[in-house]
Structure formats: structure tokens, C-alpha cells
Amino acid sequence: MAKIQMKTPLVEMDGDEMTRIIWKMIKDILLTPYIDLKTEYYDLGLEYRNETNDQVTVDSANATKKYGVAVKCATITPNAARMTEYDLKEMWKSPNGTIRAMLDGTVFRTPILVKGITPYIPTWTKPITIARHAYGDIYKNVEMQVKAGSKAELVTTDANGNETRELIYDFANEDGIIQGVHNRDKSIASFARACFNYALDMKKDIWFATKDTISKKYDHRFKDIFQEIYDNEYKEKFEAAGIEYFYTLIDDAVARVIRSEGGYIWACKNYDGDVMSDMVATAYGSLAMMTSVLVSPDGVYEYEAAHGTVQRHYYKHLKGEKTSTNSVATLFAWTGALRKRGELDELPELMKFADNLEKATIQTIEEGVMTGDLAALSTLENKQKVDTEEFLLAVNERLQKLM
């Protein structure tokens, strides 16, 4: 059988620990036998990031801007223990954070649904995608503990040196705390465009929610920017695609989400998205069954799994023990990237391959062959728990039939 050809390379970002092992297995078992795989390779493993003073991360982000589609393996974000373990020159930043900032991207996370793993919320029969704004709010805050007798004010100084002051609170007789947060119109607009573009791409409704009734300047600004961009740039496109943009208050949104059947994109401010993406992932069953894609406002895509490097399994692997590590989210990162590359380069064969590989993966699990984490969740009667490699080989058997 002739291999499927590619025109433009994918930007390939390798990673760390068990996911790095799985990365190679996926390529060897499921990709290179079928595709003449073209990638521009960047090793984002912690050792090479350390060796290059993290320049490799910057280079990979620039390559993603150039080519438009990337696929990324999970990577270690170092802490004090990793500093010692890897003898690092310094505590390098999160590669995801660096890439997200360079692409000005929004992260979209979507659960992968399979029969036998029922969401904890029975009405959820379709996936809910969480879109999280990745800039500002409490993540770039300034905080202070305040002593009694202090007065806290919000002060801005304009270009001409003129000050505007607002009293926050007069801590006349008591200690307390204060926090300053900010956001930028440009970042909010980028977030809005990424959300609207992704909704058009996926042909799904989009919901957005803030607390603008209480936060009449801060949250209201988010609401206004979204509405303005929607009305001026996207309304006609949405109507033509038969999808809608829906705004409501965050508390109403949560109630509606719980009652809904799913099947839409839920755009959230930074903190809301941080919290709700974990809630949604857990309610659907597993972080290892979540896809994650970073989308820039100018249409650059970076696909990855929503989970970490599976350190515990990696240490077992190093001892020569078999592991039963779930590879589904990593596999779907590859299929997402290949499908998008096929779409951009007008390669229907490549898109069909990505579809077939996803079908084969879901079919494998629904026929009872799965890794240990899914076996613990699945309600199927005849389950077979397999190791990491056996699962990929089982997927390959089904893929061959679909081809």
C-alpha cells in the first residue's frame, strides 16, 4: 500500500517521561507505516531545554507561526525537585506558557466520549469544550496584606501625569487583604476572535459568561468586546453556519451547563476556565480522555494532550516493568494535527486517515480492550486490561480493517 503523502511539515514538539515513550510508539505503530510523515522536529524534553537555555521552546513556537500547525507531547514544568533530578541551570518556565504567550493563543479542551464510560452528569451526551482565556486576572495579580490604620486606593496615572484615585477600603480598625488585577482590551479581543473562529471551525454554538451585573467595568468590558466583535465580524458567518453566540451570567451559565446535553463551546475568563475545565474533565471521566488545542487569533493551531508526563509510570518503565498508560489523548493530538494539516493543504486522504485512526481507537475501547485507568471506569462487562503497547497494537488491528 502506498503511503499517504504530505505537502507541508507538521511542527513536532517531543516531550518528557512516559509520554515521550508513548509518542515514539504512536509514530512507529500507527503513523509511519501509513503516512510519509513530514515533521519539523523540536526536542522539548527537559534535558534539551536545559542544554539550549530554553531557546528550543522559542524556536518551536516560531516554527508553529511559520507552518500553522503543531503537535506537542506533554512536557515537565520544573519545580525544586526537578531542579535537582535533572541538574538544571535554572527553573525553566512552562513550555506551554511560553508557546501560549508567543502565539497569543486560547486553549480549547474537549472530552473524548466512548460507550461504557458514562459521564457523572447523565444529561451530558455530547462533549462540552472549555475555552479558557489565558491572560491576566488573578494570574497576573498584585496582592498585599494590609495593617489596621491603612487606607487602600486604586490609583492610575495617565500619560500627562494626572492621577485618578478610587478608595478601595479604609482599614481604620482592622487588618485585611487587597488584590489588584488587570486585563488588556487587545488580549480580550484576541480571545474573542479565537473563540468565534474555533466555533465556526467546529460548527458549534458558543456560550460566554461573566458577572457583569456586579463587575460593571471589569467583567462588563469582556461582555462588550465579545459583543462588538461578534456583531461586526462574525454575526453573518454564524447565521450562515447555523450556529449561535449566547451570553449569560456565570451563575446562570453553570446551571444551564449542568442541565444541558452538551455539544457547545463554553468560553470562560481565566479563573473560571481553570476551575471549570477540571470540573468538566472529571465529570466526563478522565483527564487522559481530553483533547487540548491552542488556537491563535490568526488561525495557528497547536494540538496536545490535556494531561502531564505520567511520571509514576515512567519510573516503572525505567525499571523494565510493563505499564498500562492511557495514550488516547496523545493519539488524538496527532489525529487533530494531521486532520488540520490535511484540511489546510487540501489532502482528503490525510483527513480520512485521521478520522479512521480516531474511529479505530474508540472502537478498541468500546470492544472492551483498554488500559487500566479506563478499565476501572468502564461499565462494559467483558473488559480486557492491556499494557501501553498492546493497546496501540489493538488499535492498529482495527485501523488496518478501516483502511
Q: What are these regions, as identified by a protein language model?
A:
Residues 257-356, 363-367:
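Glycine-rich phosphate/nucleotide-binding loop
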Residues 36-41, 202-210, 234-247, 342-354, ...:
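Flexible, glycine/charged-enriched surface loops at secondary-structure junctions
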Residues 46-60, 223-264:
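N-terminal small/polar loop signature for handling phosphorylated ligands or for N-terminal nucleophile
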